[in-house]
């Protein structure tokens, strides 16, 4: 089981819309792939890399050029944000 935070929902939508501006079919594939990766994370929440240097509970898993940031919760995972791998996402999530 996985759930998306409002931020993660907005991130996925924004990325898909950006891709769709030039390549609608690619955007649909990306969106479907992102949700499938989130499902896998929900089934195996320890699959990603632990990120204690940012926050003790956070993990990350790459998806293409993007990084899915999540935390393990009872019964699965909560997707916190989806960001480009080259971004300084750590700075946004530090307490």
PLM-predicted stretches and their roles:
Residues 1-31:
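Arg/Lys-rich, positively charged N-terminal/basic patches that mediate binding to nucleic acids
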Residues 3, 62, 78:
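Conserved beta-strand segments that form the floor/walls of ligand-binding pockets within enzyme
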Residues 28-29, 49-51, 91:
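Short, hydrophobic secondary-structure boundary micro-motifs
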Residues 46-75:
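Basic/aromatic recognition patch in beta-strand/loop cores that engages polyanionic ligands
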Residues 66, 71-95:
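Enriched for short, Lys/Arg-rich terminal
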């Amino acid at each position: 089981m996985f759930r998306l935070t409002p931020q993660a929902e907005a991130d996925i939508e924004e990325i898909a819309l950006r891709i769709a501006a030039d390549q609608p079919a690619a955007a649909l594939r990306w969106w479907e792939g992102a949700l499938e990766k989130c499902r896998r994370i929900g089934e195996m929440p320890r699959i990603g890399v632990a990120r204690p240097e940012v926050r003790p509970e956070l993990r990350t898993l790459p998806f293409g050029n993007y990084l899915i940031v999540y935390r393990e919760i009872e019964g699965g995972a909560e997707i916190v944000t989806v960001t480009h791998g080259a971004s300084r996402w750590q700075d946004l999530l530090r307490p």
